[in-house]
From Swiss-Prot:
The gene is uvrB. The keyword ATP-binding applies. It is found in: Cytoplasm. The keyword tRNA-binding does not apply. It comes from Oceanobacillus iheyensis (strain DSM 14371 / CIP 107618 / JCM 11309 / KCTC 3954 / HTE831). This is UvrABC system protein B. Belongs to the UvrB family. Disulfide bonds: none annotated. GO terms for biological process: nucleotide-excision repair; SOS response. Forms a heterotetramer with UvrA during the search for lesions. Interacts with UvrC in an incision complex. GO terms for cellular component: cytoplasm; excinuclease repair complex. ATP binds at residues 39-46. Residues 624-659 form the UVR domain. The beta-hairpin motif is involved in DNA binding. Keywords: ATP-binding, Cytoplasm, DNA damage, DNA excision, DNA repair, Excision nuclease, Nucleotide-binding, SOS response.
């Protein structure tokens, strides 16, 4: 029987959510290829999409434009679908420095990466879930368009073990090694197996909490048990178990032999061409590097950077489309693209950036030309591999507008909150006028965001406001992650009343205490004053019942007019709905989350103090202790699936290491 998505939620769809759910569901079931959910900030878009997934009941891929957002979505979907396979698939590098070559200085930068074991486990959990069940929802970052092994090869190498099956114990051990499990009787961890008399214990690549114990009687599997990997407690008996490969790049021995021959052939041709063109140094470099890799592949079955030979390992021709996570899904899967106005351009840009870097490596003898085929998908290829897409955004981009002119709107917030009122005021006397407005907000214990166009303007304004005794902070691009989190927290708890910045579009700035957003130089056309950016910036005041936006401008630009008209249109719809249903808007009360405990010193002080200053005074030894403590906290956060906290910690650790 086909498993069903089971939505668990304390509340029912409200406002225009029911209409949006019905409309999108109907269009998907009718086979419409593209559609867009135009959802204003704070209208519960994730809840709407969860309802659509439940109604359609197909495997679903949700793509977000960065790990933090993917982590937030993953947590939300997991809450809505606790009994289904909600998975997380992002790049497993904690940090990643791709190999590169700078010809001008003759500098080769080796690939340097730290792989997060927890995320690697979740990636395996995602791919294996797709082969085991139907009710799968995977939240991914754009890394899902990067090369992965051949899904057919991956599937064909799954070890299927049943009770009563005839199988020789030693044959099982050989099979496990072939799918890249390592025997380790001492350090028993994910992706390893150990042998104890007549039983073999395996920890699958997609889990580490439990291991599978296969007990033999002669040449027959007598019993299969699930055992707690830590305590050895028996969880239960299994009739059947599927052991998925420990790597996504699995290649059978016979295929590996053909691949090695093809690599040798390509190497020969490339060396000849290089020598004919007088590139002797490059030829020597290429020969040495490739032969070393080939030797490793013959002996070990893999080498460092094996993904650069993926075209040969999957026996594809030059220029062929790489296999990606999309190929692991069944034919009828649904794709949801979150914040599509940012995510789609990102997908479009991946291929060109990757090729430019690799071309330099090939030209200078660091890689064979076939390495160019270990690449992300081109946008056209991405379109070919996806059959039905739903774009979700408060400000859809040109691609969405072109492909789905009839959008599904979701404008009413379940809280009854309205889009802010918008006023345009002249630039002359803007600062005095702004100060008056700030004072009104301070009396009501509300906060103000001010966005300027230049760094100098931000600094001057911050200094001036400080001089006249206002509590103000300046959020600029050089500010470190930890400080940024602290500044936002300080604004919320009232340490500051005003926050000045240039780009207020980054995540984390949805602050319910903010009742005024002031946009200086609103009539200067450009990226941060485009229609889309203005609507997003204005949305920062939409979480407060007294939300208001003041634009300072001497003329009305086209972008301003469109943004104001759209906001007023939404506000009218929201007001009418509230009047009809007797709803009074109420500001969202959101608790102030504690900043990550960065230092033991900070934990001991009851009053809230900026931790960064304390860190600066530390000795090297104390700093190392803090980093170690934070790394443990980061790993724990990743284990608890709080990826937002883990990402914040990771950034802070990198900054501390750089300063140390």
């Amino acid at each position: 029987m086909k498993e069903k998505f089971e939505l668990v939620s304390a509340y029912d769809p409200a406002g225009d959510q029911p209409n949006a759910i019905n409309e999108i569901t109907k269009k998907v079931l009718a086979g419409q290829r593209h559609q867009t959910l135009l959802g204003a900030t704070g209208t519960g878009k994730t809840f709407t999409m969860s309802n659509v997934v439940k109604e359609i009941n197909r495997p679903t891929l949700v793509i977000a434009h960065n790990k933090t957002l993917a982590g937030q979505l993953y947590s939300e979907f997991k809450e809505f679908f606790p009994n289904n396979a909600v998975e997380y698939f992002v790049s497993y590098y904690d940090y990643y420095q791709p190999e590169a070559y700078v010809p001008s200085t003759d500098t080769f930068i080796e690939k340097d990466a730290s792989i997060n074991d927890e995320i690697d486990k979740l990636r395996h959990s995602a791919t294996s879930a797709l082969f085991e069940r139907q009710d799968v929802l995977i939240v991914a970052s754009v890394s899902c368009i990067y090369g992965l092994g051949n899904p057919e090869e991956y599937k064909s190498q799954v070890l299927s073990l049943r009770m009563g099956m005839e199988k020789d114990r030693d044959q099982l051990l050989r099979d496990l090694v072939e799918v890249q499990y390592a025997r380790n009787d001492i350090n028993f961890q994910r992706g390893t197996f150990r042998v104890r008399g007549d039983s073999v214990e395996i920890i699958p690549a997609s889990h580490e909490e439990y291991c599978i114990r296969v007990e033999f009687f002669g040449d027959e599997i007598d019993r299969i048990r699930e055992v707690d990997a830590l305590t050895g407690e028996i969880i239960g008996d299994r009739e059947h178990v599927a052991i998925f490969p420990a790597s996504h790049f699995v290649t059978r021995e016979e295929k590996m032999k053909i691949a090695i021959q093809n690599i040798e052939k390509e190497l020969e041709e490339q060396l000849k061409e290089m020598r004919d063109n007088g590139k002797l140094l490059e030829a020597q470099r290429l020969e040495q590097r490739t032969n070393y890799d080939l030797e490793m592949m013959r002996e070990m079955g893999f080498c460092s950077g094996i993904e650069n030979y993926s075209r040969h390992l999957t026996l594809r021709g030059p220029g062929a489309v790489p296999y990606t996570l999309l190929d692991f899904f069944p034919e009828d899967f649904l794709v949801i693209i979150d914040e599509s106005h940012v995510t789609l351009p990102q997908i479009r840009g991946m291929f060109n950036g990757d090729q430019a870097r690799k071309q330099v490596l090939v030209d200078h003898g660091f890689r064979l030309p076939s390495a160019m085929d270990n690449r992300p998908l081109r946008f056209q290829e991405f379109e070919d591999k996806t059959k039905q897409l739903v774009y979700v955004s408060a400000t859809p981009g040109p691609y969405e507008l072109e492909h789905s002119p009839e959008m599904t709107e979701q404008i009413i917030r379940p809280t009854g909150l309205l889009d802010p009122k918008v006023e345009v005021r002249p630039i002359e006397g803007q600062i005095d006028n702004l100060i008056e407005e700030i004072r009104i907000r301070m009396e009501k214990n509300e906060r103000v965001l001010i966005t300027t166009l230049t760094k100098k303007m931000s600094e001057d304004l911050t200094d001036y406001l400080k001089e006249i005794g206002m509590k103000v902070a300046y959020l600029h691009s050089e500010i470190k992650t930890l400080e940024r989190i602290e500044v936002i927290r300080d604004l919320r708890v009232g340490k500051f009343d005003v926050l000045v910045g240039i780009n207020l579009l980054r995540e984390g700035l949805d602050i319910p205490e903010v009742s005024l957003v002031s946009i200086l130089d609103a009539d200067k056309e450009g990226f941060l004053r485009s229609e889309r950016s203005l609507i997003q910036t204005m949305g920062r005041a939409a979480r407060n019942e007294n939300g208001k936006v003041i634009m300072y401008a001497d003329k009305m630009t086209d972008s301003m007019k469109k943004a104001i008209d759209e906001t007023n249109r939404r506000r009218t719809i929201q007001t009418e709905y509230n009047e009809q249903h007797g709803i009074t808007p109420k500001t969202i009360r959101k608790e102030v989350r504690d900043v990550i405990k960065a230092t033991t010193a900070a934990e001991e002080t009851e009053s809230y103090e900026p931790k960064t200053k304390q860190i600066n005074k530390m000795t090297k030894k104390e700093r190392e202790k803090v980093i170690e403590q934070m790394e443990n906290e980061m790993k724990q956060a990743a284990k608890d699936l709080d990826f937002e906290k883990a990402a914040e910690l990771r950034d802070v650790i990198l900054e501390l290491k750089a300063e140390g």
